């Protein structure tokens, strides 16, 4: 069976039905969810305006209000898990990349949901990958620390002295390996795979097209923008 995307019920339909209930409990529940139906918190009270069935989907909550990020995380994690389940039924593998992973661990509900997703994903043919520049938050949370310790594949770039020492304890690194992380330069670090730990060097020349494509350094971006005639410096001339 097929359906029109515009006919899918949204939260306001549920809200209206609650208000029509003769029992006072229904109206009390309607009052409870009212902030998510009207006003600034009604972000998810609308049909989706993007195609989530594409092969490559990116979710970004950077501009989401702080009081909505917890709800946003839960909705996106649920959407991701549903996609993993659907892909498994189609015998399709799913790659899940979570940037700024430490943000998930600011919300207790998101932590629990993400812990289940991370633990069950491999059985469903998914490969979850977490990315963070703040390893301290990961280590200080019990669930995320266990996730880190039980991961089969890790890429560890340069770390501060305290973070390197803490990582060494969690994943059982030698003193020499901890020192390598402390002294690692750009593109250098340790590769942990299947119980093996290998130092690596993968520097990208700063004058290459790949470097220009992947750099996030503000000075680089300003320089490239000016070279293209799009930066403030270029416009001021």
Predicted feature residues:
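P-loop NTPase motor domains
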Residues: 1-126, 139-142, 180-184, 189-195
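Short linear sequence elements within intrinsically disordered, low-complexity coil regions
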Residues: 19-20, 49, 205, 216, ...
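Short helix/loop capping segments that flank catalytic or ligand/cofactor-binding pockets
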Residues: 67-69, 199-202, 211-213
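Glycine-rich loops and low-complexity Gly/Arg-rich segments
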Residues: 82-86, 120-124, 153-156, 179-183, ...
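Accessory regions of macromolecular translocation/handling assemblies
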Residues: 94-95, 103-115, 129, 145, ...
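Conserved ATP-driven motor cores of ASCE-family P-loop NTPases powering translocation/secretion/packaging/pilus
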Residues: 115-205
């Amino acid at each position: 069976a097929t359906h029109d995307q515009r006919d899918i019920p949204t939260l306001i339909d549920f809200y209206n039905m609650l208000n029509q209930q003769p029992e006072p409990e229904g109206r009390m529940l309607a009052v409870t969810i009212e902030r998510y139906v009207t006003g600034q918190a009604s972000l998810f009270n609308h049909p989706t305006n993007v195609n989530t069935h594409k092969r490559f989907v990116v979710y970004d909550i950077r501009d989401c209000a702080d009081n909505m990020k917890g709800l946003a995380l839960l909705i996106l994690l649920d959407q991701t898990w549903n996609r993993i389940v659907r892909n498994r039924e189609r015998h399709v593998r799913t790659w899940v990349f979570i940037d700024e992973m430490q943000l998930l661990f600011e919300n207790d509900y998101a932590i629990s949901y993400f812990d289940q997703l991370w633990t069950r994903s491999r059985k469903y043919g998914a490969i979850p990958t977490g990315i963070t520049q703040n390893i301290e938050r990961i280590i200080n949370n019990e669930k995320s620390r266990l996730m880190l310790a039980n991961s089969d594949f890790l890429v560890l770039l340069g770390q501060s002295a305290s973070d390197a020492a803490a990582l060494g304890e969690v994943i059982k690194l030698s003193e020499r390996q901890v020192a390598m992380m402390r002294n690692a330069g750009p593109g250098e670090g340790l590769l942990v795979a299947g119980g093996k730990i290998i130092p690596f060097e993968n520097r990208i020349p700063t004058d290459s097209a790949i470097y220009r494509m992947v750099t996030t350094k503000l000075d680089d971006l300003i320089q490239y923008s000016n070279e293209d005639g799009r930066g403030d410096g270029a416009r001021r001339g």
